Amino acid sequence: MRALLPTVQETKGSWVGWTGERDGQSEVVHADGIDLYPVPISSQEVDRYYEGFSNGTLWPLYHDAIRESNYRSDEWDSYVDVNQRFAIQIANIAPPHAAVWVHDYHLQLVPNLLRELRNDLRIGWFNHIPFPPLELFQRLPWRSEIIRGLLGADVLGFQRRQGADNFVSAAEHLLDATELDNGLVHFEGRNVNVGAYPISIDVGDFELQASGRAARQRTAQIRSRLGDPEVILLGVDRLDYTKGIGNRLRAFGELLDQGRLDPERHVMVQVATPTREGVEQYQDERREIEQIVGEINGRHSRLGFPVIHYLYQSLPLEELIPLYRAGDVMLVTPFRDGMNLVAKEYVAAHVDGDGVLVLSEFTGAADELGEALLVNPHDDHALQDTIVRAVEMHRHERRPRMEAMRKRLETSTVSDWANSFLDVLIDR
């Protein structure tokens, strides 16, 4: 939402989406300078379409999560119904020959459904999460239907080249589509542009807020309240089993047990934003994480000074930016992630040019932020060693790394991302 809002405002576009509420409103709302067209989703559809097929089937499959996906026909039927409802709403409000940008794995059937309703439209689709290799995608009983749904678009965008290649492989294998030159895929008389468009953030806004007096004062206050430790390690994630929070916490605990980190000098702050709280897998993940936090704090905390400060809450940007600035070492270690904008937000917030980013090699951000300390989060020893290296890194190494990442971000903003995609779409 934060990444897309400036683009919709700048293009004077309309937003079609779900409010996030069961049996929510359907009245048009004008807010933040744009028209919002809600698509109502019933309580049963939330269970089947959203929590069921989208997040119980597609999410773990696309992230290659080590857990079984659900393959239920009633949930697939609900997925089809909701995608059809979105397509109808878009078809009803889109001006002639408008550009329509569909987002994410929840709406993979919309491009072709919309094409059947409004062939005059220029349709783009962007995937915010990984797209899996063929050997994983083939497990899905409705694999061909999803590929056909996506091939209704004019432009298909993925976070990484790897995701785009995986899609092309699936389209060739499952529907006999043909890969042409210049990123085109030919299918049933049409050419579809397939490419990598790595998403970014509003770098200027982050830098402006991070440079402000309020952010500086709040950063100092955070450090003081944490006991002015020598090093603050920071994790900011949605509470999701793909984010590797448990592995990260265990690595920190092991380093304390081994004496490689000192609880009087090194503290950790872990923010876990609530998400999908009605899904059992996420409830289990929360319990496991909170148990790990309790065990480590029980072993290593002093009275009034926990070694891990754990927040299960969503923080506003005005609180998050000072927290980023306070973090000396940022730990972004998901098992797999389409991009991970937290890594970019941390870099943008460090207007002082200091700080160390520890980054999973299985994120899209790793393609762009090569000066981070890249790590395989599945390798416990490598993760521990990388954390220690980050903590001990001298400023003469820290600052050039951070400066290089900051310069790259400044030439790859959210506006650059949106414009690169929309330019291709509008030129079709």
What is the meaning of each model-derived region?
Residues M1-R428:
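Catalytic cores of carbohydrate-active enzymes across secretory and cytosolic contexts
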